[in-house]
Swiss-Prot record:
Compartments reported by the entry: Cell membrane
Keywords: ATP-binding, Cell membrane, Membrane, Nucleotide-binding, Transmembrane, Transmembrane helix, Transport
Any one GO molecular-function label of the UniProt entry: ATP:ADP antiporter activity
Family: Belongs to the ADP/ATP translocase tlc family.
High-level lineage: Bacteria, Pseudomonadati, Pseudomonadota, Alphaproteobacteria, Rickettsiales
UniProt membrane topology term: Multi-pass membrane protein
Function per UniProt: Provides the rickettsial cell with host ATP in exchange for rickettsial ADP. This is an obligate exchange system. This energy acquiring activity is an important component of rickettsial parasitism.
Bilayer-crossing regions: 26-46, 62-82, 94-114, 149-169, 184-204, 224-244, 287-307, 328-348, 357-377, 381-401, 469-489
UniProt xrefs under PANTHER family: ADP,ATP CARRIER PROTEIN 1 (PTHR31187:SF1), PTHR31187
This protein's name: ADP,ATP carrier protein 5
Cellular component terms per the entry's GO annotation: plasma membrane
Amino acid sequence: MLSTSQSRSFKNKFRAAFWPVHNYELGKFIPISALMFCILFNQNILRILKDSILISEISAEIAGFAKVYCVTPVAALFVIIYAKMINHLTFEKIFYYLSAFFISCFILFAFVIYPNIHIFHVHPDTLSDWMNKYPHFKWYISLVGNWGYIVYYSLAELWPNIFYVLLFWQFTNELTTTEEAKRFYTLFSLFGNSSLILVGFLMMNLSSEDTIIKKFVSISDSKITLVQVSTTIVAIVAIICCLLVRFISKYIFTNPLFYAKIKKSRSTTQRMGLIKSFKYIAKSKYLWLLLICSAAFGFAINLVEAVWKAKIKELYPTVNTYAEFNSLYILWTGVAIIVMTIIGNNVMRMHNWFVAAVISPVIIMVTGILFFVLIVFDQQILSLFDGAILMSPLALAVSIGGIQNILAKGTKYSIWDTSREMLYIPLDDELKTKGKAAVDVISAKIGKSSSGLVQSIIFTLVPNATFTSISPILMVVFTFVCFAWIYAVRKIYFEYQKIT
């Protein structure tokens, strides 16, 4: 009897640690995991393409301007439109309409605009003359003259915040109780983020000189072929996402076993108007702290990424070589996320919310400072380790920046994302939907655009400045933002305890 009891105890502990999903819950767990996998699959293909196109075709410096003057206004407009849509359309229809809009735009760019970019854009010589004539406004001139790249970049930048952070997690939070979230969310992250590894291998092949595409079609321009094939894959996976949303809406939302408790609470909720809704959100200290946390990540990581991506372009100057390196980085990011998800799953169950949530800002701050120190004091460090470092200063900077970003994204997309989503579960429907839309879409873009604003002001005032030359300033700002993030995490933990 004792042996049987001990065996059951061990089995229960093993299951709780590695597979805390009951068999009857698989009908909910598997479709949601598949949806997350597909959304992140597309997200990372678009991430590789948008950076490879914008930075290789124009420059790394232009990205900050695009985030401030293009991405942020579009994100703000989307939140207003979304708040209107949610009062008149079902979630399912909203997902379909937004998917159709984004995929149509990506297809238009890949098959019409990009192959004929010389028709749609200002001639490079004319653009160069204007930029030389007005050096303080050269980046703004470049924004307008290269509008096709900017629009594509802006839409690809919005994809993660709209389809993953907002729509997917809103959908999932609606279906999941707090008790289920503690067991499911890290596993969602584990399965969903495994898509990064697949995307990494796929895009490395598509962007390489020996791509498998050559076996099926003749390639006249490798970068255009890369974008067109990748966009076709994105469109197919987007259709699969729509089918999964349809399946979940039809078979899970209507199943009392999966949705009865939440459905009952929803029936008593009244919708507020747009103006009243935003006034309600503005009064929430809880959401303001959430906004600071999300904005801080976007701000901090964008400062490091901007310098790192400028170094990548120096080492890999073409669209395809940049994309190939980016694919390798995405692959290892996927590996890091899976490892940290397993660690985070146990941290979240064994410790309180604060311990799990503070891991991300601490790791990002420490690794980010190390990267900036290498950039700012590169010559001193190389002379100190003369002969011991078997690579060029440029290759070393790209490698260290890659490690920093892999660790930062690994902790963010595994531990921090799941910790943040738990904060929405105790909230009422209005804050879960419109509040989440405002925080998740706007805050991330405020963070990135604020970072971009700092960069754009410097590059406007000092036209000849480069990311390397302004790195000391960026390092100081980066450190301050990370400390603010840690402070906000501590404050919101106290608020979270009050309502759970």
